[in-house]
Amino acid sequence: MSEQKTSGSGSAAAARLQIEAEYKDKGPQWHRFYKEICETCDREAKEKQFSTSESERHTNRGLNRYRDVNPYDHSRIVLKRGSVDYINANLVQLERAERQYILTQGPLVDTVGHFWLMVWEQKSRAVLMLNKLMEKKQIKCHLYWPNEMGADKALKLPHVKLTVELVRLETYQNFVRRWFKLTDLETQQSREVMQFHYTTWPDFGIPSSPNAFLKFLQQVRDSGCLSRDVGPAVVHCSAGIGRSGTFCLVDCCLVLIDKYGECNVSKVLCELRSYRMGLIQTADQLDFSYQAIIEGIKKLHDPTFLDAEEPLISNDTETHTLDELPPPLPPRVQSLNLPLAPNSGGILSLNMRAAQANGAESIGKELSKDALNNFINQHDMIHDAEVADSRPLPPLPVRAFNDSDSDEDYLLDDDDEDDTDEDEEYETINEHDADPVNGHVPATTQPHADDVNANNEKPAVPVDEQHKANGIDPIPGQLPASPENELKRRKRNEYQASLEQKVNDMKRKQRENEDKQLAAKKRRSLLTYIAAGVVVGVICAYAYTKLG
């Protein structure tokens, strides 16, 4: 389709009618339409011989969150500082829309330093986060920013020579906006970096309405972080292709409609996919993209919509509850690598064997640290559930998670079996990546062949060495479990005990109700017998008087 420069609301209205017609026409066969787009993009990638060899290198596999989501070599971001130049990220561009983004995965515990180094080197002005840290009780992204304001609370990344300080925070109904001071320790230069954290993308699905998403897009645009005169904005979810691709597709198409009065949505998607594989993971995400584009043509030119201010909920120091954070990683990481004895595979092997001995399925070797952490914690949850009281009441809660249907909890998502998630597609492609508890784990990387012995046991590697190799230096003399993590553990145990007490109270009340019902039944039976006796007595007395 040709795209000649036009102007005026009439062209935008015509574009809206054209996209609406295509949307309605493809509606009955939407999944086939999505599949055809994917096949076209895959065919073009093969014809152009797009490779992913860097992501498959022996030394880089452990830096990928998902095994099936690898950056193309021709568009990957190359880190300049340090011994590691690889990060799972691509520069995605659409020249005629004057848009460029960096699409990347949610940082792992060992890639936080790489992530911020990329932000610094690429001169990015903003980070757009479209997921929660945990969803469906699975870690989707490591917490990569400081929790509290102040220089003394800054995140220190000495190996990549950067510090990250939280300087401002604003919480809105549908997103959180954070301002960071990113400082280069080599030059002592500092730069302000904004983070737009979209917090109400529903559990494993798509937003019910594009309005909140469009308001978020407007706020991002108004900040100027998408302009060509600044570095590309960093966009991520968990895999960096589903929700991230949705954001980029909607933004690019709306820009093209403003500039040219027309847009071929499927063509734009294929162009974006030529920079990073798999953008828009599901047919539902493509469906939502069309809805957002159609609605955005109208809303982003409506003064009422544009002038409406997003309600500010708070601008206080950020605090997280136990439910909002993943299980503390440092104690787990230490336990995974401390050897039990010479030539031993360490506590990880012991935990894995114990889990398998108790009936849990074995898990594949292609696991990231987050996935391993999920596996061990979930096995602990199973064990706790097995010892719960067997009465026909709800079992003891095994984890302090929020089970409401609200999307407002922006760091922890709840469980929804009926929806499909952008990352679920990649977690369930390979059967040997299945989670032994919930049926899926965000499986990612294969350990190196020379790191696994004949018993499939991974030799111990000091945590300090792991962090130094991946952009994070540990604090000298730091204990495996910090006071903060110990406090979290105690609070979690106290909360667990409180929940257990509540369930026991429920059981006690049920027993009391059962006893009351039984007593009432006995009373009713006794009254029935007494009434029957009285009736019989009256009849006998009446008969006696008549006969007498």
Swiss-Prot record:
Disordered: region residues: 46-65, 386-517
Chain intervals with Acidic residues compositional bias: 404-428
Source domain of life: Eukaryota
Motif (PXXP motif (SH3-binding) 1): 327-330
Effect in UniProt of substituting residue 237 to S: Abolishes phosphatase activity
Motif segment (PXXP motif (SH3-binding) 4): 459-462
Alphabetical list of CDD domains matching this protein: PTPc-N1_2
Entry annotation: catalytic residues: 237
Described function: Non-receptor protein tyrosine phosphatase. Required for maintaining dock/dreadlocks in its non-phosphorylated state. Negative regulator of InR/insulin-like receptor signaling through dephosphorylation of tyrosines when recruited by dock/dreadlocks.
Name of protein: Tyrosine-protein phosphatase non-receptor type 61F
Organism encoding this protein: Drosophila melanogaster
Organism classification: Eukaryota, Metazoa, Ecdysozoa, Arthropoda, Hexapoda
Gene: Ptp61F
